[in-house]
A protein has these predicted regions:
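Beta-strand-rich domain onsets/edges
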Residues: 18-72, 78
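Short, solvent-exposed, Trp/other aromatic-anchored flexible loops in extracytoplasmic proteins
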Residues: 105-137
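Short acidic/polar inter-strand loop motif in beta-rich domains
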Residues: 140-147
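Hydrophobic h-region of N-terminal signal peptides that target proteins for export
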Residues: 9-17
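Short beta-strand edge segments in extracellular beta-sheet folds
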Residues: 151-155
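Short flexible loop/turn segments that cap and initiate beta-strands
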Residues: 84-98, 102-106
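Sec-dependent signal peptide recognition
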Residues: 1-8
Length: 155
């Protein structure tokens, strides 16, 4: 009986601990040999409503979203130097977003200033939910290209 009540208590605790409306999602990060790559995805509606100043800045650097664009993909390229995090901006970044339902979209991401350093970003069409494959193509000045893949579940 005690085992059953403990199990029930744990399940209820987990159910109430879940947050359905997390505003800022934790970015996903991949560690490469030379640097780290982090992505974050936020819907355009959330940006307009909660962060109008940030939306205006993104609109200035990325242009106005097209008719079917629903989300903003942000990419940060960074590395740790001692205790400091240094954001790297001397790259060109392209993103390819694929889903089982929508056709693949590949776009060059625009550089824009962020609170801690330069980020890269662009507008994309994503559905309300689903699993997305996001491929990033990062090129440096010498022509070397890194491909980084993220599987992203939009809920």
């Amino acid at each position: 009986m005690i085992r059953y009540l403990t199990y029930l208590f744990i399940l209820l605790s987990l159910a109430f601990a879940q947050e359905d409306s997390v505003l800022i999602k934790t970015p996903l990060t991949k560690k490469l040999k030379d640097f780290n790559v982090s992505i974050g995805i936020v819907s355009i509606e959330e940006l307009k409503k909660s962060f109008p100043r940030a939306y205006a800045l993104l609109e200035k650097h990325n242009g106005t979203p097209q008719r079917y664009d629903t989300h903003h993909l942000a990419v940060a390229i960074w590395k740790k130097e001692g205790d400091k995090i240094v954001y790297l901006s001397n790259y060109k970044v392209e993103a390819e977003v694929r889903s089982p339902i929508l056709r693949a979209q590949r776009r060059e991401l625009h550089k824009y200033p962020h609170q801690y350093g330069d980020n890269f970003g662009g507008w994309f069409q994503l559905g309300e939910s689903g699993l997305y494959s996001i491929n990033l193509y990062i090129k440096d000045d010498s022509g070397k290209t890194w491909k980084v893949n993220f599987d992203y579940m939009l809920q």
